[in-house]
Every structure is written in C-alpha cells, then in structure tokens.
C-alpha cells in the first residue's frame, strides 16, 4: 500500500517545509503533475493532528490534492475516502503522504489527459 514518493525534489521540499512550519500538523496542498510526478505545489490549508480543511473548488482536473498523516500511517480514513470519491469524479487525484514526504499513498490517480508532458 505504501510506495515511494512521486514528487519532484522541489515539490517534496515545499511540502516538508510547510508541514514543519505548521508544527507537524496536517496540511492540504494542491499539486500540478508533469511526467507522472507532482512537479510543483501550493499549500492552501493547515489543520490539526487529525484533520485539515480540504477545499473542493480550487483544484482542477489533472491536478492532485495532497495531505499528510502526521502518524505516518498512510491509510485513508472514511473522510478521506468520501472526499476521494468527489475529487476523483472531477478528475482530481488524491494523495496521502508522511511528514517527510518520503512515502505516498495514491488513493485516486489524476485524470492524465489534463497533465503536462
């Protein structure tokens, strides 16, 4: 279930820094894909140890929404699965990462037709 991270070094560092600056709590980011990896991302929300707001209107088909699980357990919660269904129907991927962004679990793959090559 856990796999190597599919993030560019810059995108991974941006997310690691945001998580660290938020005190290790959950953060929510939107990433743009290129060649099947997250090439760049923007952090939009910070939450607590167990939850973070997951904005529905800002991401576009072909992008991914990303949040971390501070516990390091990359298993989608019921809330994660509910949101994954909504995002997935819109062509948006859903990714859960650990705090150092070395592992990721891709709950939903993004719609590839909208990705940059």
Question: Each PLM stretch: what is its role?
Answer:
Residues 1-58:
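Glycine-rich short-loop/terminal segments
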